[in-house]
Amino acid sequence: MGMVHTTGPAPSFGLSDGDDPIFNPTATSSYTGPVRTESDSLGSMDIPAEAYWGIHTARALNNFPITRRALSNYPDLVRALVRVKQAAALANKEIGAIDADKADLIVEVCEEIYNGALHDEFVLGVLQGGAGTSTNMSTNEIIANRALEKLGHTKGDYDHFHPIDDVNRSQSTNDAYPTSVKLAMVFGLQRLLEEHSLLTQAFRNKGAEFHDVVKIGRTQMQDAVPMTLGQEFNSFGTTLSEDHERLSEIIPWMCETNLGATAIGTGITADSRYAEAASRHLAELTGLPFVTAPDLIEATSDTGIFMTLSGTLKRAAVKLSKICNDLRLLSSGPQAGFGEINLPARQAGSSIMPGKVNPVIPEVVNQVAFTVIGADATVTAAVEAGQLQLNAFEPVIASSILQSLAWMTNSFRTLRLNCVDGITANRDRLAAMVASSVGVITALIPVIGYEEAAKLAKQALATGAPIRELVVQAGLMSFEDVDAALQPEKLSNSGG
């Protein structure tokens, strides 16, 4: 094992630049450099000598030629995988299940990878059969071969440092992988919440800026009653803050781990002290409240927490998409639409219509929301498809939610920086719309009564005359009293 030699074309170890989105599973690698031979229970394979991954990774590369979206494209997952391996090594060292020097070396190598080293060695596609076994085995191989290198041995010389006996000690894919997936999602969720807070504040800032801009509110796309543009934008911030609370509440739930459960939750091959020690070390390494699940068999078979997170992300995406619908509608025009607000011009909007500018930022956020909705449907189906003591479909759950987290985070950022921060109000147009709207008559009902208000509203619609003038002409109020009643703070019930 580990002997290096040269061979002809080797089996396919990766995907070529041209086979995404359509991959040709019969394609072979053009690699002709030095290789080493590794063996497993199925036989032997030649592995590129310089690769840190090994035979289990090579088999998975051949078995799952589905996508070029490799594990290396999910740095949060790579970082989470090695954090879990660190916690396992520290727990094994504590209980005497592994030599202290080996445990320390695992921790050292994992820290290198956590800080960005060897991420390009995580070559497997994120979608795979086997409930994540290939990902776990590949991680073990990369850590073991880097450890061998640091010890002065040849990669693949597993007699000195073994991917399973050492790196995977006291673990199964069925506890190490789901714990890593949860941790990766928490990493992504923390970043999402940071951007979410900034976007929420951006809407509230606009609410303060537009506090004195009166407009007509609408229900069912029909003119309703006056409000301020500031109230409208502040409401956007409020609805986002509610989602922030719901998403934040999920983090402690994600920190319930089944480490120590091993294969199905019975803890076979793991010392009885390992589970608590592993969770404790993971909590110390991450600063997160990781604890051991009270029922490890249930925790190994159940994936409901992923559906909770995905559903909450969908809720946040749908609500933000509705806000983007409003931004597009309020900015429609510029001459023949609502034209109440101006979105920052980001790029030319047409190859045939000069001067056209489209609301491209809200549009892309809408599309992210559509994708998140689809991802949630995928997660729901995958969670339902679990059988007996394990759900085999966590890889698609992981890829779906991690993509949703990343895309939503990016959409929050671009919406804030490239749209919300630069929105301006068309104050003159809004004032003219308020002056010509019959909706303001509602504000005068306490003075003139409903019946008189209804008559004047009908007259205004028939003649086009402003409500203000009709009220004065009817002798019901003076211009001064009408203007006082139509002050922004009274129209919007915001004070005064």
Regions found by a protein language model. Give the residues of each.
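Conserved, well-structured ligand/cofactor-binding cores
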Residues: 2-496
